[in-house]
Structures are given as C-alpha cells and as structure tokens.
C-alpha cells in the first residue's frame, strides 16, 4: 500500500482555504443555533431539512451537551413518546420499558443525532463561543451573533469578536440561557425577564418546556433547558424527550415565521 505524500505547507494551505471558504459562506445564515446539545441539534436538523441555511456554534470540541453525561455518568437515558419518533427517524435503537417509555444508549443517541443533523445540511462549528448578539431598531429585532474562539476567552485575552448574521437566533445553551441572558441585560427594550429555573418536577417539566419553547423576542428563540431558565419551569433530569421536541418545535416556529415574513415582504414589494 502506497500512501499519498503531502507536505506540511500543502496541509496548511488546504485547511486554510477550505476553512475561509466555509466562514465566508456561513457569515450569513437563515438560522444560527447556539449550543450543540439535544435541543440545538434537533432544531438544526429540522431547520436544515426544511432547506434553511443553518449553522450551529458549540463552545466545546464535542457535541451532545448533556447527552454524553447520561444519568450521573451512567450511559443510559430515558426518552418518552412522542419523541421516540424522532429517534426512530434517525436510526437510534430503543429499549422499551413500558408503553411510551424507552431507554437509549447515550453515545449512540448523540452520535446519530449529530450525524443526521450534518447530513441534513447543517454546519456545526466547534470551539466557538457566542458572547453577544446583533440587533436592529425600527423594528426592534435580533439579527445575528458575535462569536469568539472559546480558547481566547478561556485565556482571558482582550480580543474583539467577529459577527455572524441570521434571520433567527436560537439559544440552546442549556440551564444558563447564555444568549438570552446577554440580550436581556444589554437590550432592555426587548422586555425579557429571566426568573430562573425551578427544582425538579419531571412529570410537568417535559410538557411545559415544549409548550413554552419558541420566540422570546423578534428574531430570538429559546430551546431546551434555556426555556426552563426564562420561563421558571422545573428541571427534569435525564429524560430527554422534551429536549428533542423543543428543538423540533422551535424549528417549526422559525420556518413558519420566516415564510410569513417572506410573504409580507413580497406583498410590500408588489405594492
């Protein structure tokens, strides 16, 4: 077997060329999702599947969010109906424990969800932190995000970010609702109040989280555990049905809103 020889400078140039082509492309998006956990990946999967240009920024060098930790590091988590339909769609094996309740392998879950998201057309970028948003007035709207290398922030270096535009920004950062928290603090006219999440009550938390997922302010959406933080909903522990269904609902809301905005714009242009 003869292995193709590639020198170091070619390696560098090929990587830089492909990388900058990507960054030039996804500097403008339909949807930017912050956080590659279960809700973020689900939102990205369904957004990309619908043909929306979708980019996911994940501050870590991995994806899956809380999936990988399983339940207190045990490698299994619970999924309930109807979220099992999403896992069947992407080929995750389900172990049935009772009607509508299943246990899945955490590694398989996050690997297949990420692969399905990429195959649907979404771009996932690791090692990038979103630390602010872009906004516009008249009408007031969130129109993108400010991004920085996670390593730069960890090193406490004073470096300005770059900016990425999006018609919809999704906060899927988990319990801290980091993007919405920044927007709430720095753009008070958005009128966002963050009461904080409540202690565990899984029987009601799953339903409430899905129902309350969606647009928080024009152009800004909440998915997954970020919803519990901004809506004072209880936490639910290692049951992940709501995370998937929340991401799917947010994607559906974005698709509907962007279609409505597009129709309005076309109507105005005709007039």
Swiss-Prot record:
Its cofactor is Fe(2+). Pathway: Cofactor biosynthesis; thiamine diphosphate biosynthesis. GO terms for molecular function: iron ion binding; pentosyltransferase activity. Its EC number is 2.4.2.59. Fe cation binds at residues 160, 175. GO terms for biological process: thiamine biosynthetic process; thiamine diphosphate biosynthetic process; thiazole biosynthetic process. The keyword NAD applies. PANTHER family: THIAMINE THIAZOLE SYNTHASE. This is Thiamine thiazole synthase.
């Amino acid at each position: 077997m003869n292995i193709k020889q590639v020198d170091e400078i070619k390696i560098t140039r090929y990587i830089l060329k492909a990388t900058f082509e990507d960054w030039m492309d996804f500097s403008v998006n339909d949807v930017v999702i912050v956080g590659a956990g279960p809700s973020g990946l689900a939102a990205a999967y369904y957004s990309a599947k619908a043909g929306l240009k979708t980019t996911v920024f994940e501050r870590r060098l991995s994806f899956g969010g809380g999936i990988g930790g399983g339940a207190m590091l045990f490698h299994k988590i619970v999924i309930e109906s109807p979220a099992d339909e999403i896992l069947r769609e992407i080929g995750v094996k389900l172990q049935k424990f009772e009607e509508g309740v299943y246990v899945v392998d955490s590694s398989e879950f996050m690997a297949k969800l990420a692969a399905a998201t990429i195959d649907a057309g979404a771009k996932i970028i690791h090692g990038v932190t979103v630390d602010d948003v872009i906004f516009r007035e008249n009408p007031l709207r969130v129109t993108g995000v400010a991004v920085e290398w996670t390593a730069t922030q960890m090193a406490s270096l004073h470096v300005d970010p770059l900016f990425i535009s999006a018609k919809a920004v999704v906060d899927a950062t988990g319990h801290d609702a980091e993007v919405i928290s920044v927007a709430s603090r720095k753009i008070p006219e958005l009128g966002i109040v963050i009461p904080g999440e409540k202690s565990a009550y899984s029987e009601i938390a799953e339903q409430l989280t899905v129902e309350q997922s969606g647009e928080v302010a024009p152009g800004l959406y909440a998915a997954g555990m970020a919803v519990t933080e901004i809506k004072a909903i209880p936490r639910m522990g290692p049951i992940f049905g709501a995370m998937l269904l929340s991401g799917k609902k947010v994607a559906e809301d974005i698709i509907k809103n962007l279609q409505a905005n597009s129709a309005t714009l076309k109507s105005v242009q005709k007039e």
